[in-house]
Amino acid sequence: MRVKVGAIIYRMRYETIHNLHIPKIGYGCWQIGGQRSADPADDDKSMAALRSALELGYTHFDTAEGYAAGHSEELVGRAVREAGISRETVFITTKVSPEHLKYDDVLRCCENSLRRLAMEYIDLYLIHWPMIGMNLAETFKALNRLVREGKVRHLGVSNFKLRLLQQAVKLSETPLLTDQVSYSIPDRTYAKNGVLEYCQQNDILLTAYSPVKRRFVRGNKTLQAAAQAHGVTTQQIALAWLAMQPRVITIPMSFNPQHQADNLQAAELILSDTEIAMFG
């Protein structure tokens, strides 16, 4: 797919998995509509950011019932409707919160998310965080039902370490699509604990949230040198490092249209083996 940013046309890179084409760079919706609670005073700012992202060519939007107490979902759905685009052209991820993992709660929360999004189905539904003492089999019984009923098309998890991820794979009646975790150049926790390798070996996407640690990218001389060599920003190098890895996608967030465009363009960058090795 070609994406036009300003006067330049870029070719977006995708991960192809289970007959899906998922963009390497998606749009994270944390802070859209507020943070832990809804902040309608910021709706104009949030809607402007979503409109800009859609106009730039973003198609994957990642939200959650826990983002702004569900208001983020409402604004994402509104932005898609107001853009006048086909529902099939966007890929919507949302998440059920860890306090809602009992069977009936999962079903109820999915219905609430669908209502807030004003959509007939969710493309990807994640367990947002594992909960101590949760009955994962009970949770997946509900999730599998949602897939069978057509309310959810794909299932995934978030913040699952290897043992729990393996359990989730066994419990899901359909191929588990992703484990969404914190992953970046300075944060290799899920590479060190085996999750990244397991995902790459088992056709599961690792979705990297918090992909850019701003304090790190601004002060890292190796990143600065690579950015200068490519004529881009250090943030774009950090995103390109993720986008080049097989079975890895990422979901940076920005309200700033220029930064949104820069993030999208990062998927075009090709880093050399030498540059990648320099990042450790």
Predicted segments with their positions:
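N-terminal binding-site loop/beta-alpha segment at the start of enzyme catalytic domains
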Residues: K4-V90
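A short acidic, helix-capping loop that chelates divalent metal ions and anchors anionic groups
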Residues: Q31-S37, E99-L101, V217-R218, H259-D262
